[in-house]
Amino acid sequence: MAEFDFAEEINSEYLEEEYLTDAMTGGQDKRRQLYYQLIQSMKKAESVDIIVSFLMEAGVKMILQELENTLKRGARIRILTGNYLGITQPSALYLIKRKLGDRVDLRFYSEKGRSFHPKSYIFHYTDHSEMYIGSSNISRSALTTGIEWNYRFSSKKDPENYERFFQTFEDLFENHSIIIDDKELKRYSRNWHRPAVTKDLDKYDIADQETEDTKIKPLYEPRGAQIEALYALEDTRAEGAKKALIHAATGIGKTYLAAFDSKPYKRVLFVAHREEILRQAAVSFRNVRNSEDYGFFTGDEKSTDKSVIFASVATLGKSEYLNEQYFAPDYFEYVVIDEFHHAVNNQYRKIVDYFHPQFLLGLTATPERMDGKNIYEICDYNVPYEISLKDGINKGMLVPFHYYGIYDDTDYTKLHVVKGKYVEKELNETYIGNVRRYDLIYKY
């Protein structure tokens, strides 16, 4: 599932000079929220330095666009954050790397023997600098409605104390930090488990979002593992890859991931084995693309002129449709194969072999097959990102659950076997007729 977020339109009255303040205390009055003051300072700054204990995904999303605007003006941005206890979310770091790349000097505080709890935002102008210092890390609630105390002062008014703070930042950044490059980010993400304290932080951010009273418009954005996977997919394409397999547990949001990743492409094909999946996928793509320009290629519908086509394997895999009369091999720029572990089957393979898109994405939660057939060769053994069920639970993206092993007394001995398989009609009747089986399922 994708995150349903909001694109915020800041009312210009809050940005007038008379509403600027040096003391920010949070709460519902936007004039007392740190976020609106930071945006004003960022719009004028020639360089920006940020030092905070942790970064949260929701907070980064709020300031990301203004950070990019600042970079476009030629400004320098440095960010120093902590990794202690794993409060900094990997997705927050991936957001920065994906959107801003190496234009931002992003680092972890590296000393393990000292605590790291600073929260300061420093803006440098032509003839002076100003510093915000207080209690706000980069989370949505801390930047807006949370009770956070922050104070702004200028290097002109208090040069001695400004210099003391700034030189401390310089020392920490240059001598007590490690650069967050791709290798370090992957290492941090791989080892990251969602700490209990972030459950409250996430709760505050969500509550703040739900009570938002600014002018808003609905927006679907990637979240969590989707952000990490998108970064990995963009990286693998930059290296020249034409195919990739994403192995992600059910519930991570693979369909939305495909919708986000394929958004820049004009003609997209989404293939699945059940029409129900196609209909659900269409909703995801419509939300992400904000477009009704999509159609279906199934037993009852044969759309060929839409930007996004959702096709059933059973229909598209027929020879009568895999030809120039319906679709040229290079018609689709981007092809998604859902349930990619089925791709070794005949009809799936016909589709995969026929089309030659700019990029092919396979999605699966279960890459291993009981028959030993290899699905990895179909995607050139390229798996840029994977997240298991266990990892999804540990990272707080999926809920934990309990397995129940329940004895099923269904009697298969009277069923006929043809070519190594039970007769499907008899099997269905046996299951449907076993009322005790239903009782067991409902009981547990």
Say what each PLM segment does.
Residues 1-223, 227:
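PLD/PLD-like phosphodiesterase catalytic module centered on the HKD motif
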Residues 226-238:
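Pre-Walker A adenine-sensing motif
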